[in-house]
Amino acid sequence: MKLLILTCLVASAVAMPKFPFRHTELFQTQRGGSSSSSSSEERLKEENIFKFDQQKELQRKQSEKIKEIISESTEQREASSISSSEEVVPKNTEQKHIPQEDALYQQALEQLSRLIKYHQLQMEVVHAQEQFHRINEHNQAQVKEPMRVFNQLDAYPFAAWYYGPEVQYMSFLPFSSIPQPIFPEDAQNTEVMPEWVM
């Protein structure tokens, strides 16, 4: 009986929820009074909302920076294509001062574009190789003929001299007579009988 009570107590202790240390204060205030618990809940909600707003603001700023970098890189590409076709002397007033971070972002974007082009070329090569292999397999399948099956011994050119005439067309006993033992007719007159006949 004591063992049963002890196991029940242990099971209930294990089944109780364990609260993290930072929420023990909240758990104790809920037991103490409902007014303090509602204020702490509101405070936690406000903190979560504030953190969420900060994350949204950071994401928005990052997306704006990325858009600016992309637009600048496209403008520079267009300007470089125009300057390569026509010799235009850039004015100092038109040039923008690019901070070091923007230069790093620009280099990263250029590397990404080169990497994307490289992967596209590799994918095209792989696709061409697969297509070539498919065409080869298709052509080989059309050329191949099924192998002829030779059931007779003399179908091969070496069969005539390898197998003698008595071996080539040997008549075999039917399989139904195999279980019946074969022994000489005068087996009763002999003194020694085979073991398998007994």
From Swiss-Prot:
Q: Where is this region: Disordered?
A: 28-47, 71-97
The UniProt similarity line reads: Belongs to the alpha-casein family.
Q: Which GO terms describe its cellular component?
A: extracellular space
- Matches recorded under InterPro entries: Alpha-s1_casein, Casein_CS
| Annotated signal peptide | 1-15
The record's keywords, sorted A to Z, are:
Milk protein, Phosphoprotein, Secreted, Signal
Summary of the tissues where the protein is detected:
Mammary gland specific. Secreted in milk.
Q: What does this protein do?
A: Important role in the capacity of milk to transport calcium phosphate.
Superkingdom of this entry's organism? Eukaryota
Q: What is its main location?
A: secreted
Residue numbers bearing the Phosphoserine modification: S39, S80, S81, S83, S84, S85
Report the subcellular localization: Secreted
Query: What GO biological process terms are annotated to this protein in UniProt?
Result: response to 11-deoxycorticosterone; response to dehydroepiandrosterone; response to estradiol; response to progesterone
Put simply, this protein is called Alpha-S1-casein
